[in-house]
Amino acid sequence: MITKNFAVNLSQYYLNLKLSFKQFYQNSNFYDKKISKTKDITFDYKPSPYLLSSIVKYQKKKYKIEDFALETIWQNNLNNKEFKKLNNFFWFFSLDLKSSKKTTQAVINNWINKNNHYNNRGWDFDITSKRIISWLSNHQLTYEGCEEEFKKKFNQSIQKQANHLLNEIKNLSEVENKIIGCAAIILTGLVYKDDNKYLTTGLNFLKKIIKSSINNQGFPKSRDIKQLVLYLKYFIIIREWFKESQNTIPEYIDETIYYLGQSYAFIWQNINQDLLFNGNYNSNNDEFDQYLKRFGYVFKNENKELAGYAVLKNKKVILSMDIGNSPSENFSRFYQSGALSFEVISSGKKLITNSG
């Protein structure tokens, strides 16, 4: 027992030491210099923001940038949720295109001035990934009509943030963050065609994600239904970026979308019900279905069993069951229910939900 506790404490000490060293390194001038290696490149491809409507909650009411209290926008007393929302800049998608470009660009310029040097909170991997996607996708406000000095500063900041993602993505364990970061890196490569390192490296990481985390049936190895939907959304977004930018779509992206789509049809579209297995929750996939229809994606799957899930139904009753094995330890972070979990749904209402 003493030996075991000593080993655990030693392991924890090593991890803490490793984390401390990493934080020291990333806050150093050496790391800043490493990720600051940028080029004078051109913003070529202008991605359409509506391609992201599967992951962005668009509001009917649009706001003008002038409606926000810009003087206090970077105050330090924000809670974690507010901080993430502010610094990932996804709130730009709710801005009216009649907003002042000059004011919008001033907000970005202010952020760059305050955060040009890496800090672990503002440069969190997920926050940085979404910030890149937002800045590039909202180019009508963030980039168009800007002065040359800001244009250069903007391009350098995007590259610097993308360089940080390239440095970090290989060390991530959370696959959800990896796919979002991968999308941001790939978009950077499509936008700035003069530097192919972002596109080449981003696609290489995407292939690794496919190989390491998706099984041969097109279902995440975690058996996580939420993760399946997230994967499908981002793979389609990446495909649409390739299509819109008039680049050849890699075959493995089409193939992955096909198999993910079949899994999505099996687990959701065939029954139009959320199965609350494995940490899943009530979703709003109806909106995603509209997105798929709008972009011409049709998925079908007539199987009764897939990836360890079984679904039997007639006109009124649906019987669903988890008959698969638990995911391996590497993919079990959010796994909750066990084998033989089942649900009975009648006329659209759940009669029995057994988490196993």
PLM segments and residue spans:
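Short alpha-helical segments and helix-capping/turn motifs at coil-helix boundaries
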Residues: 76-77, 327
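Short alpha-helical hairpin
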Residues: 59-75, 82-83, 103-110
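Extreme N-terminal leader/anchor segments
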Residues: 1-73
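Aromatic-lined, polymer-binding surfaces characteristic
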Residues: 80-257
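Generic structural signal of hydrophobic/aromatic residues within well-ordered alpha-helices
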Residues: 10, 17, 21, 111, ...
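Sequence-level motif detector for i,i+2 pairs with an aromatic at +2
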Residues: 51-53, 58-60, 86, 272, ...
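Carbohydrate-active enzyme catalytic cores, enriched for enzymes
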Residues: 215-355
